[in-house]
Amino acid sequence: MSAKDMIRTPAVEDYSKAIFSLESRGDEPVSTNALAERLGITPGSVSAMLKRLDELGLITHLPYRGVRLTDDGRRIALEVIRHHRLLESYLAEALGMPWDRVHDEAEVLEHVLSDDLEELIAAKLGHTTVAP
């Protein structure tokens, strides 16, 4: 297992994606409570994970204000979001899965999509850059 693989757990990816989404709503750092609400977990659990993300260099902690993704954290978030969107499109368009099911399936599969399969799916979809 590479160092990259040890950092890239589903939890790290989910947190990065959630922080990215909350950051995109405004200029303020993301608070522990906002992140806990977004992920449906307790603020205590969020605090423990934020400490880990900070140690990994994926976030910058601003005391009493919240957190922001670093460039590395943002790269992870954007890659997971791309995986998710490609998978949603592929599941619906190529496999005919109903749209009311594709999001939940993509949530699971986004964490295990290899670079090779990502490229094949993108090619199959015509290298789409539009979110479904």
Range-by-range predicted roles:
Residues 50-51:
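Short, hydrophobic-biased segments on the C-terminal half of alpha helices
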Residues 54-62:
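A short, conserved structural fragment
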Residues 65-84:
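Basic, amphipathic "hinge/linker" alpha-helix immediately C-terminal to the N-terminal HTH DNA-binding motif
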Residues 92-132:
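Anionic-ligand-binding alpha/beta catalytic cores of soluble enzymes and soluble regulatory domains
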